[in-house]
Amino acid sequence: MKLVDEAEIEVFAGNGGNGCIGFRREKFIPLGGPDGGDGGAGGSVYIRADENLNTLVDFRHDRIFKAQRGENGMGRQAYGKGGEDLTITVPVGTVVINVATDEVIGDLTQHGDRLLVAKGGRGGLGNMHFKSSTNRSPRQALPGEPGEERTLKLELKLLADVGLLGFPNAGKSTLIRAVSAATPKVADYPFTTLYPNLGVVKVENYRSFVIADIPGLIEGAADGAGLGAQFLRHLQRTRLLLHLVDISPMEGGVEGISPVEQVRAIERELEKHDPELLRKPRWLVLNKADLMFEDEAKAAAEQIVAELGWKEPWFLVSALGREGTFPIMSRIMAFFDRQKEEEQEARNAQ
């Protein structure tokens, strides 16, 4: 499932250092010639693609990036030190657009791709360059040139890593709000989610993954009922499915359907639409535990798991109270890490 993530940033290359006005002054050479050195070049700003990143979420807060200014020239024909370049890392697949011209500067499609987005200013010339037959002691030097400044738009087509499955009102929108910065509409009636919502879940050390809240499925979704038909296809490219089920006993569960039947009904829809979806990793999330006493919720969860013969990981949570939600996210990150290691081992074995 691909949706667009975007961010706007400002980049400032470093100004060049100023040239120096200086004269040679040594013992026995009281009236030496000009020896002012040139200023150093300003640092440039680059954007580099990094396969370890997959969202632009960090640019929500860090929007201004400045490279280092070049140092001024000095006497004795000493050149100023050049400013350090600044490299901004973004996910592979990021498109960089110049906001002022709406021009695409570059498309970073491979890990390690590097793009110059703002060039540092050249250093100014020192007065040693202005000596002539008619001017033996020039008191003239040039200032450094300003570095380039640009406002850039970063666009990334996001591939959702995790898809949320479940009947209407199973709590998918509530869960995605609890674990990410997304704010989908949440209400206590079916089909609140009319379009896929996307959230970026940040785990430790600035790592993150993308989670998609697919509109609620009902029986017949594969045949066009409810809102599910047009969104079932979005699940095909996710790496993991979280199957949310309302275990609260109120009115016998969602729309009077028992939790076990909720699971089986959606499995039937997946089977009809694409049997491969049933072979995709799918974890069971038993939600709304806050509507029951703790021991009752645990007993109900264990009974549901037993009736289903569930072999994959399962979790008992309250998305509304954020109870038990973050351990799931950490477990997902670890699962993706293992996937990446296995893929790398497979490539190395070829």
Curated annotation (Swiss-Prot):
Limits of the Obg domain: 1-159
GO biological process: ribosome biogenesis
Domain of life: Bacteria
Spans annotated as Disordered: 126-147
Cofactor: Mg(2+)
Binding residues for Mg(2+): S173, T193
Residues that coordinate or bind GTP: 166-173, 191-195, 213-216, 287-290, 318-320
Record function comment: An essential GTPase which binds GTP, GDP and possibly (p)ppGpp with moderate affinity, with high nucleotide exchange rates and a fairly low GTP hydrolysis rate. Plays a role in control of the cell cycle, stress response, ribosome biogenesis and in those bacteria that undergo differentiation, in morphogenesis control.
Official protein name in the record: GTPase Obg
Organism name: Stenotrophomonas maltophilia (strain K279a)
